[in-house]
Amino acid sequence: MRIFLRTIPRSLKLGLMLSACVLTVILTSALVALAIKAAFFAEEPFSNVCKTHACLAYSHRLRSSIDDSVNPCKNFTRFVCGGWQKANELSVWEDQFKSVLDRLSKTLSSIQVPPSGQNEEQRAAAVYRSCMAILEGSRDELAAVRKALDDAGIVWPQPSRDADVLRSLLYVAMKLGWDVLLDFDVVTHGEGVELVASIGKLFLFVVKKHERLRASRGGHVYFDFLKERFRRNDTDSVTYEQMKNFETYALQVVKYSRGRAAAAHRVESFLDAPDLGLTEAKWRAVLQELDVSVAARVSVTSTTPEYVESILRVWRWNGSDSFHTFVSWCTVQAAALFANEALIHNYYDTDYETTKAYHGLFCVTRAMYFSIQAPFARYNADVLKGNAGEVARNMTLTVRSAFLRRLSNWTYFDESVTVVGNWSSVATVFFNFERHSGEGGTEKRLQLPDATDSFVDNWKLSALFKRPQEVEDTMQSVYKLNYHIILYGKRDFQLMPYALSYPLFDSRLPSSLNYGGFGSEVAKALGSLFLYSYSNVSESQSMIECMREGGSIDAGQRHAERTVGLGALVDAYDSVARRASDSTVHGLEKYSGLQLVFIALCYVHCRGQASKGPGEPVCDISLRHVPEFAEAYGCAPGDPMNPPNRCPLL
């Protein structure tokens, strides 16, 4: 070789040496890349490869969503969701609900509803159909809505003059079921009549619309459309600027007063406020006009007294006429959803499919008020075929046990603090998947008239009885697309009736995918209960403050709830994988079981192109604080998903 090199010209010799160096660099880079890829996707031995229909469908979903060009240690959300967001308008979350609603609609439409003698399921089906008929244009009840508003003393868009605020508030709640600002439950006992005031059942719809209009700046069009449909003649009307300014101001006053329900106590300022025309004699007169017999004294209590007090402040600071106009504006917005197809589209202001999905949710929740289980009874009978219920319950117990172990080992653990009432029972968790008689309503509900084709008339029936607060909270959670509801009084959580839906859960999927989807919801619910129970402990507040990452306190709370139980989720999956080796999914063999847990966890949070709000890497915010994630993907110290400083968790 030395002889050969001596015979080569110097320039050529340098060129060969340079080429050798370049080749060495290329080979080294390739080896490093392969090593990194191997670290990301280190295979674990699987007992078998799942090729069931559920597995193949899920594999197709993930493979079309995962963007392999993205380093999961740099941006895990984009790694998992890049493909989905490019190809879909709706989020995975919304897409799942759309699928659930399609199945529910077919089920409810197949139920035979007799004109009389209806049972709970038949009445719920009739309410749902009458609601959907408005959206589909087969019924128009604008005339009935306007008549009902007239009966309540609401003349919007005309400004209110010398209006009876108390009568309108009580009438829309007790006769129409269109309570927005305030709802009232009448409790009669030996001492007289007790009115329990609470946040209106339709308040959420006004708040959500206000938030969307603030983001889209389409308020003037929305206002004008309502004004033209509800205007009675050519008399003067309120302006868009007047209503926008008052609504913005009022919601700022009341929004910080919507705390969790407390034990009911008296609100004397509502019963006796002469400057607002409120006296016990006035309450008696209005109640008697609304067919409520008042033999003795009247009292007003509330489980949300701060909210009620804030409503009174808005009333007092602006006078009865202005406040009545605001009450009217809120009521008209809610009543429009009962009127006709055009007004429904004006409210949602989006494409037909999205409107159909969200109004379908509205209709389902209206039916749930009459029977929280009936709309989902047949749906869940299909979902829970085979061993699905047993698998879901065992998963829930496994995650609860792992969470309790972590909690017990926490430095600040306090045996006197109850996070979960009974760790070994899931009766409350799966309450909505069991048949129950009575469902906790009042006796009046057993004597309800039969439902008809009129949605307006059907919804008036809701004012004849009062459901427990947790039922109303469940309805609100369904409309918010939540998978569970926290029952603080019972120190537990309750799954929504659709929580065991694909792709969140399917008993035919490997444990990794079910723990990443359904299991993460169980962990999140337990995280919420933990933070609530330890809210007076500074260390739990430090978790929330750390998870804010410069955002709002509410954002920090949400991120902390989602994150605090993820270590327990990993423990739960590991315990299952050790007992019986997990299966992999055909087409996803390169991912380990734990990697699939994190992928499935993130996938259900993938946003679509139409998603509102900041495009933050929602999965990264939580998973960067979970050391098991960095270990599973071999993330180098200092990578975005393996930071030097993590938030303190359990």
Say what each PLM segment does.
Residues 1-26:
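Helix-loop boundary elements of multi-pass alpha-helical membrane proteins
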Residues 27-38, 528:
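Membrane-embedded alpha-helices of multi-pass membrane proteins, especially ion channels
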Residues 35-54:
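Ser/Thr/Pro/Gly-rich low-complexity linker/stalk segments immediately outside membranes or between
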Residues 53-55, 71-74, 79-142:
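Active-site-surrounding "flap" and adjacent substrate/cofactor-binding loops of secreted or lumenal enzymes
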Residues 65-86, 213-230, 566:
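Hydrophobic/aromatic-rich, well-ordered segments within soluble, folded domains that form packed cores
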Residues 79, 200, 496-498:
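Active-site-proximal beta-strand/loop segments in catalytic clefts of secreted hydrolases
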Residues 97, 101, 240-243, 252, ...:
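Intrinsically disordered, low-complexity linker/terminal regions across diverse proteins
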Residues 108-404, 434:
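Noncatalytic, helix-rich "gating/capping" subdomain that lines the substrate-entry/channel surface
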